Structure formats: structure tokens, C-alpha cells
């Protein structure tokens, strides 16, 4: 281009972009190593190491599992009627009551976790002809023998244990969760001394379901001084339905029901400390920012979280291909 003037000077106009001394390597469909002037990391690869208590309501299980809190293990009484968005179970959690098992533990745990509440309503069950409120030295409540607070251990009265047949209708407009159990004595002598009959039976029914459990008498590994066990079961009673309990022995009866709710509550196993901070996304490793589209911290998440990927890094090129000028 000629410049105005009398000296016939010319200038050159260059179209292009600035190169940088040290570009960023990115992957493309056709090449694993392309250097560009600028790139943005898309993968969140670290956590804060702590769980933020805002905006989600975090309930720290401390020494209690969710199921122990549900049953009413004496050392978990502090959790009665609690609510949460995320229940955090710790590796140090332990049971400290009558040894038990839950045949479908994971399903019950998930059901209660998603409900987000341990709200419990006591009901007036009538248990005629039996002794109520059984306890054990394996389940101390203070200095005294105790039991799970949400369950009622029924044993013989005098020398009899009559057939029990109890009904409880659901006249409300929400689902009710009933927790009950079956006692498995360690010997035949223990069976008859508690329930008279040589073999008990427990049947729990609604219009939609029925469960019949026959106790398994026999010695098991000793736990807290006991070789007997309790198996825990549950029944959901829908509005308009009725709960029917029939038994001639070995029944661990419900004292009422847990009010079921629908929502997005959940549970997570983590030993990360809980802190006063704000984060929408929580993993077992701790909270993470959600300003990137991907994360590789943990597959398990709660809240509004980036999508999990296996890659440690994914970069988005935000600049042109970097071709520094070679000078001699």
C-alpha cells in the first residue's frame, strides 16, 4: 500500500494472530498434541476436603448408621425425628444393641435415606396376653437393660403366649413405614422359656403383600454376649390399606410408623469433616466447585454436580493454533 507523501514509502498490513512463547497442548480428533495459544480446563480434579453444610442440610451420623438411628439403638437416640438432605455415615459408626440383621439392608437404607426423615408416630397397638417391653443387657439404656426404642419385644405372660392377631388401618393420606422383627433364639430351651411354643411364626400382611417368617433356632457367633439374633423386616402401608400382624411367638412388634416422604434426600459414606461453607456439589472426598462441566473426583455425588469422567484433564481450545515465528 502506498503511503501519502513524496518519498514513495509503502507499508505491509498483516492479517493473523499473535503467537505465544509457551502454548497449551490439546487433543483433537486427528491429533493428540496440538499447541494452541489459550485453553480452558474442563475437568474438576480436586475437592475441598470438607463437606459444606450449605445450601444442603447435612446430618452427620457420627457413631450411628442410618439403620441404627431408625431402629432406635440407645446411643443413637439423638437422631429421633431428625430430617436431612444428605445423611453422612462414618466409618467409625457401630451398633450397640441387640445383634440383628436386615435381609435386604441396602433397600431399607435407600428407602429411608430418600425419605429424608426419621419422623416417628407412636400408635396404640393392643398386645393382649403377652409381656411387653422386653430388654437385654446387650442393649443398655443408661445402667438398665434396654432395647431398640422403636420396637417392642413381646414374650410370654406367665406360662402362655396366645395367638396374636392385630390390625392397624392407614386412614391418612400418606404412606406409612412399619419396622418389625423376628427373634431367633440360640437354643430350644431359650425358645420355650420366652415363647412357650417350640416353634413360633410371624405373618405381616397388607392387601398388597404378605410376609411369613419362621424363626431359625440355633447358635450363632457371639456378639455382645449373645448367640441369638433378630431379623429386621419392614412393610409399607398405603392410604386406605390395613396392616395385619399375626403371630404365636418370636414377634418383635412395631410401636408405630415412620412417615414416608418423597424427595431428593440421600445418604453417603464419607469421613470428610463438615464445615460452614457453600457448595452445591458433594462427593465422599468433600465438596467440589460446579463451575466446570466435568469432574473426576468421585463417581458418587449429591447435588448439582459436574458429570463424572475418567479423564484427568480435558481442555477446550479458546485460542488459535500456536505457531511461533522462528527467527535466525
Curated annotation (Swiss-Prot):
Q: Which residues are glycosylated?
A: 8, 22, 38, 63, 165, 285
The region annotated as signal peptide is: none
Keyword Transmembrane included in the entry's annotation = yes
Per UniProt, subcellular location reads as:
Virion membrane; Host apical cell membrane
Q: What about PTM?
A: In natural infection, inactive HA is matured into HA1 and HA2 outside the cell by one or more trypsin-like, arginine-specific endoprotease secreted by the bronchial epithelial cells. One identified protease that may be involved in this process is secreted in lungs by club cells.
Where is it found, in Gene Ontology cellular component terms?
host cell plasma membrane; membrane; viral envelope; virion membrane
Q: How does it sit in the membrane?
A: Single-pass type I membrane protein
Q: Which family does the record claim for this protein?
A: Belongs to the influenza viruses hemagglutinin family.
What name has this protein been given in UniProt? Hemagglutinin
Organism for this UniProt entry: Influenza A virus (strain A/England/878/1969 H3N2)
Task: Report the gene name.
Answer: HA
Amino acid at each position: 500500500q502506498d503511503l501519502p507523501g513524496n518519498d514513495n514509502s509503502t507499508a505491509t498490513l498483516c492479517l493473523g494472530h499473535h503467537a505465544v512463547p509457551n502454548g497449551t497442548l490439546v487433543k483433537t480428533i486427528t491429533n493428540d498434541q496440538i499447541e494452541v495459544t489459550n485453553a480452558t480446563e474442563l475437568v474438576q480434579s480436586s475437592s475441598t476436603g470438607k463437606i459444606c453444610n450449605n445450601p444442603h442440610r447435612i446430618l452427620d451420623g457420627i457413631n450411628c448408621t442410618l439403620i441404627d438411628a431408625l431402629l432406635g439403638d440407645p446411643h443413637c437416640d439423638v437422631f429421633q425425628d431428625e430430617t436431612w438432605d444428605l445423611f453422612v455415615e462414618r466409618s467409625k459408626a457401630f451398633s450397640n444393641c441387640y445383634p440383628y440383621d436386615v435381609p435386604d439392608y441396602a433397600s431399607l437404607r435407600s428407602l429411608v435415606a430418600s425419605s429424608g426423615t426419621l419422623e416417628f408416630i407412636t400408635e396404640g397397638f393392643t398386645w393382649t396376653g403377652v409381656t411387653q417391653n422386653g430388654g437385654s443387657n446387650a442393649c443398655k439404656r443408661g445402667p438398665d437393660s434396654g432395647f431398640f426404642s422403636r420396637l417392642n419385644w413381646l414374650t410370654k405372660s406367665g406360662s402362655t403366649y396366645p395367638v396374636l392377631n392385630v390390625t392397624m388401618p392407614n386412614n391418612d393420606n400418606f404412606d406409612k413405614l412399619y419396622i418389625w422383627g423376628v427373634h431367633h433364639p440360640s437354643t430350644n430351651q431359650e425358645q420355650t422359656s420366652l415363647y412357650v411354643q417350640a416353634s413360633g411364626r410371624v405373618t405381616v400382611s397388607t392387601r398388597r403383600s404378605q410376609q411369613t417368617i419362621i424363626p431359625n433356632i440355633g447358635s450363632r457367633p457371639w456378639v455382645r454376649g449373645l448367640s441369638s439374633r433378630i431379623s429386621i423386616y419392614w412393610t409399607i402401608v398405603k392410604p386406605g390399606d390395613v396392616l395385619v400382624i399375626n403371630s404365636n411367638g418370636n414377634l418383635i412388634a412395631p410401636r408405630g410408623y415412620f412417615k414416608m416422604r418423597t424427595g431428593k434426600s440421600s445418604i453417603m459414606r464419607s469421613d470428610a469433616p463438615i464445615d460452614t461453607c457453600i457448595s452445591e456439589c458433594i462427593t465422599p472426598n468433600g465438596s467440589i466447585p460446579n463451575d466446570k462441566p466435568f469432574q473426576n473426583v468421585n463417581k458418587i455425588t449429591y447435588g448439582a454436580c459436574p458429570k463424572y469422567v475418567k479423564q484427568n484433564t480435558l481442555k477446550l481450545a479458546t485460542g488459535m493454533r500456536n505457531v511461533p515465528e522462528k527467527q535466525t
